[in-house]
Amino acid sequence: VHCNNCTSDLNAWVELLAQNAELCGAKVNKGELFTKLFNLSLQGAPDCGGVIPVNYYSGEGVTHFDAGRPMLLRGPESDFSLANLMRANIYSAFATLAIGLDILNEEHVTLDTLLGHGGLFKTPGVAQRYLAAAAHTAVTCTETAGEGGPYGMALLAAYRLHRADGEALAAYLNRCVFADAQSTTLSPDPAEQSGFAAFLTQYQTALKAERAVVK
């Protein structure tokens, strides 16, 4: 499943919150702010309290959009707290992926585990548990989970240089990269699965508004 949109909208919200903190005289370390906000999201409701960000900055093939407009939707009864806002923004990073995985599930494609990798997983145990709920499968993160694309490209270069004759990439990674890697695996929590499912239903409804705005 390929998704064009992930954390751009999340990053924009964190930047806005950083500007607010600076306005109040605080010195903001962006890395620490991300960590605090991610951990705060764990206090949010499993369904994000009716707060629904649509994180589309560009088109999305899975949901058939040629362009995107980031939006935030909520009802008068929604619990518009910072914890719910952050949780909803992280959920939205996985929403289109979850839609794509549901399509694969209908085609009887099954998953044993997913490997979480990239800056989204830098704060331990937050995005990892949300992805597990979204994908209905266990998610593993290594100590290097916070490293992004350059790390992956370096691994590919090392594979090209040092692989044994005929050795597949997966075998090389298991032998030379992940053999001694420290990792954690989280299985989906039933309450969070139900919460994400409720969020995803509202997200898909919100896509109707997104489609109208794009047009």
Give the location of each predicted region.
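Active-site core segments that coordinate phosphate-bearing ligands/cofactors
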Residues: 1-215
